[in-house]
Amino acid sequence: MLLHRLSKFCKIERDIVYIS
């Protein structure tokens, strides 16, 4: 589903920002 994919992408984005 698009919403699930979007939330998954947002989670990855947050993880990257958190690590940086």
Swiss-Prot record:
Any one biological process term the GO annotation gives: negative regulation of lateral root development
Tissues with expression: Lateral root initiations.
Superkingdom: Eukaryota
Per UniProt, the keywords (alphabetical) are: Activator, Transcription, Transcription regulation
Q: What does this protein do?
A: Regulatory peptide encoded by the primary transcript (pri-miR171b) of the microRNA miR171b that enhances the accumulation of its corresponding mature miRNA. Acts probably as a transcriptional activator of its corresponding pri-miRNA. Has no effect on the accumulation of other miRNAs. Addition of synthetic miPEP171b increases the abundance of miR171b, with consequent reduction of lateral root formation.
What protein name is recorded for this chain?
Answer: Peptide encoded by miPEP171b
Organism, as annotated: Medicago truncatula (Barrel medic)
Native organism taxonomy: Eukaryota, Viridiplantae, Streptophyta, Embryophyta, Tracheophyta
